[in-house]
């Protein structure tokens, strides 16, 4: 089993999904207030956040692996089109495009990308989703996770996690337009 963990500005939330008869099922969850531990840009009390996380975990589960959620407002993301002929140099091209597209020095960022298959209308290019986060925002969350004796196996944007969950739990509606609030 793996835990999904969201460290927000006012709440700490986690869920655990595990294999069910046919699909993954919700096995456990917790929501805990973290008042005055974090505001929009500043961490106020990491040790208190770790204590809250450990307390909720020990009460309900022994799961150690987690997928860490990061809010979209802390991430700069951009869709880019890249010619198929550039595939062999993709890492270099992504670094150049990140430098041009993101208003922070690359040394201050963690960034990653995901390649998507070409759109039907343009088979010569493929789409790439580039995502970058300032190290300070992710490092503080990773510090909390490590101090709580959890192992982060992935970091995912909030919006991408919601879309992925929708596709998993409602595959028959995959091509319908949806709005998530």
Enumerate the predicted regions with their spans.
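Amphipathic alpha-helical transducer elements in NTP-driven molecular machines
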Residues: 10, 46-53, 91, 138
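Short, glycine- and charge-enriched coil/turn segments that flank and shape catalytic ligand pockets
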Residues: 21-22, 38-47, 117-125, 169-176
């Amino acid at each position: 089993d793996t835990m999904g963990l969201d460290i927000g500005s006012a709440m700490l939330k986690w869920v655990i999904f595990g294999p069910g008869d046919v699909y993954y099922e919700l096995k456990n969850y917790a929501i805990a207030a973290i008042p005055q531990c974090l505001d929009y840009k500043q961490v106020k009390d990491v040790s208190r956040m770790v204590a809250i996380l450990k307390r909720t975990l020990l009460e309900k589960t022994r799961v150690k692996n987690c997928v860490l959620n990061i809010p979209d407002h802390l991430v700069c993301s951009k869709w880019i089109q890249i010619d198929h002929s550039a595939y062999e140099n993709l890492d270099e091209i992504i670094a150049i495009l990140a430098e041009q597209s993101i208003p922070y020095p690359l040394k201050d960022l963690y960034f990653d990308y995901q390649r998507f298959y070409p759109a039907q209308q343009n088979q010569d290019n493929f789409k790439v989703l580039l995502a970058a986060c300032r190290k300070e925002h992710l490092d503080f969350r990773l510090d909390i996770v490590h101090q709580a004796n959890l192992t982060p196996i992935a970091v995912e944007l909030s919006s991408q996690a919601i879309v992925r969950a929708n596709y998993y739990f409602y595959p028959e509606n995959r091509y319908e337009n949806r709005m998530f609030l």
